[in-house]
Amino acid sequence: MGITFYSLGAAQEVTGSKHVLEINGVPLLVDCGAFQGTRAEADRKNREFAIPAEKLSAVVLTHAHYDHCGLLPLLVKKGFKQNIFATSATRDLANLIMMDSARIQKRDAEYLEKQAKKRGEAFNWCPLFDESDVVKTMNQFVSISYNRKLFAAPNVEIEFFDAGHILGSALTNIRVINEKSEDVNILFSGDLGRQGKPIIRNPDTTLPPPDYIVLESTYGDRLHDHADAVLDELAFIVHRCVEKKGKIIIPAFAVERTQELIYYFNILTMQRKMRCSAIQT
C-alpha cells in the first residue's frame, strides 16, 4: 500500500487550503479553498488550478470558510463528479458562501468591464464560476454527522469530530484500511478551535490515536486571552468611545466571529457594563 501526501495551498501561507492524499495512486482531496489577498495575486493563484479534478475519488470538506470551500464550484466546473463529504452545517454554510462568491464575482466582472470600456481597453476577465456551478456542486454533497464512520472511497473510511472552530467544523480522521498489515489513521485538523468559546462547543478530544497529523498552525505561536479579559477590555473600549461620542468599527468575519461579538455585547448589556447602543452588522 502506498500513501502520498502533498499540499496545493495553506502551506507556508494561510489561505487556499487544498491537501491531496494519494492512496495507491488514487487522489482524495481534503478542502478546496480559495486564495485570498490582493485582487490580482488571488485571481492568478486561483486560476492556476493544479488539481486533477476528474481523477479525484472524493473531496472531504472540514468546514465552510471561504479559504477552505471557495473553489469547490471551480473543481466541479473542471470535471469533478464524485462526492463531497461534510457535516450538514458545513454543507448549508458552504452553499451561502459559494453563492455569495459567485454573485460578487459577477458584480466585479460588470464593474471591471465598465472601467475597461471607459479606458478604451479590451476586457477578457471572467468569473471563476457562476451560480449554476454552485448548484451543481451542492448536488454532490453528502452530509455526515459527527462520530459516524463512512467509506469515502475503496478502503478509505472517514469520521468527523467537532473541531470547535465554527458551526459544523470537523476534525477529520481518515483511516486507510490495509488488508496485509495494520490500518493507518491520518488526522486532518482543518481549522481548530479553542476551549471556552461562548457559542461553539469545545474541540472533541475523544479521537482514535492517529499515526499522522496534518495540523493547522495559524495561531500556533501565541496564547489567547481568557474570555473574561476580552469582555473587560471590550467594555472599557466601548465606554471610552461613548464618552467621546464616537463610533466603533470592528472588522469581523461574517461566520462565527460576528455572532460571537454580538453575544459579548449582549452579555455586557445584561451585566450593565455597557449601555444598549445601536449595533449594525
Where on the chain are the PLM-derived regions?
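Short catalytic-loop micro-motif centered on adjacent basic/acidic residues
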Residues: 6, 60-61, 248-251
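Pre-active-site segment of Zn-dependent metallo-hydrolases
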Residues: 11-13, 23-82, 86-139, 192-203, ...
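Divalent metal-coordination and catalytic microenvironments
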Residues: 5, 31, 63-64, 94, ...
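Short helix/loop capping segments that flank catalytic or ligand/cofactor-binding pockets
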Residues: 16, 38, 69-70, 95, ...
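Extreme N-terminal starter segment of soluble prokaryotic enzymes
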Residues: 1-4, 27
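Well-ordered alpha-helical segments embedded in enzymatic catalytic cores
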Residues: 7, 71, 233-237
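Cap/insert and terminal regions of metallo-dependent hydrolase folds
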Residues: 83, 171, 193-280
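Catalytic core of the metallo-beta-lactamase
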Residues: 8, 14, 20-23, 144-205
